[in-house]
Amino acid sequence: MGLSDGEWQLVLNVWGKVEADLAGHGQEVLIRLFKGHPETLEKFDKFKHLKSEDEMKGSEDLKKHGNTVLTALGGILKKKGHQEAELKPLAQSHATKHKIPVKYLEFISDAIAQVLQSKHPGNFAAEAQGAMKKALELFRNDIAAKYKELGFQG
C-alpha cells in the first residue's frame, strides 16, 4: 500500500504549507478533533477543562501540543514510508503512557484532512487528498502493528 514518488511529492508539497505555521495548523486540527469527537478530549488531562471553541483557541498549551503533534507527523511524512525509527517511540508512548486507541488516530487523520482542505484548497485537490489519505493510513497501520507488538489492543 505504499505511495508512489508522485504521491509523496503531493503530500510533502501541501505539508510545506503546514510547516509555515505548525502551531496554528496544529491547534486547528486539535480543535476539530475535540469538537468532532469530544470523547478524545478525555485523553488529555491538560485540556479536559476546555469546553468551548473559544477556550480552545485561547489555550497556549493546546497550541503548543498542536505544534508538537504536527512536528512529529511531519518528520514521519518526510521519511516517505521509512519511518521505523520515528514510529517506535511514538507508538510506545501512545500505547503505554497515553493509551490512545488507533480509532483516535483515524479521527485526527480526518481532522488533518479537513484543516488542509479549508486552509489550502489550491494545494489539496482530489489527487493530493488521496495521497495524504494513503500516507496517513500507512502511518496508522504501522502504529497499529507497533501497538500489537507492545500488547496494546488500542
Curated annotation (Swiss-Prot):
GO terms for cellular component: extracellular exosome; sarcoplasm. One of its GO terms (molecular function) is metal ion binding. Pfam families: Globin (PF00042). Its EC number is 1.7.-.-, 1.11.1.-. Monomeric heme protein which primary function is to store oxygen and facilitate its diffusion within muscle tissues. Reversibly binds oxygen through a pentacoordinated heme iron and enables its timely and efficient release as needed during periods of heightened demand. Depending on the oxidative conditions of tissues and cells, and in addition to its ability to bind oxygen, it also has a nitrite reductase activity whereby it regulates the production of bioactive nitric oxide. It is an enzyme of class 1 (oxidoreductase). InterPro entries: Globin, Globin-like_sf, Myoglobin. The modification Phosphothreonine is found at T68. The gene is MB. Coiled coil: none annotated. Monomeric. GO terms for biological process: removal of superoxide radicals. The modification Phosphoserine is found at S4. Nitrite binds at H65. It catalyses: Fe(III)-heme b-[protein] + nitric oxide + H2O = Fe(II)-heme b-[protein] + nitrite + 2 H(+); H2O2 + AH2 = A + 2 H2O. O2 binds at H65. This is Myoglobin. Keywords: Cytoplasm, Heme, Iron, Metal-binding, Muscle protein, Oxidoreductase, Oxygen transport, Phosphoprotein, Transport. Residues 2-148 form the Globin domain. It is found in: Cytoplasm, Sarcoplasm. Its main location: cytoplasm. Heme b binds at H94.
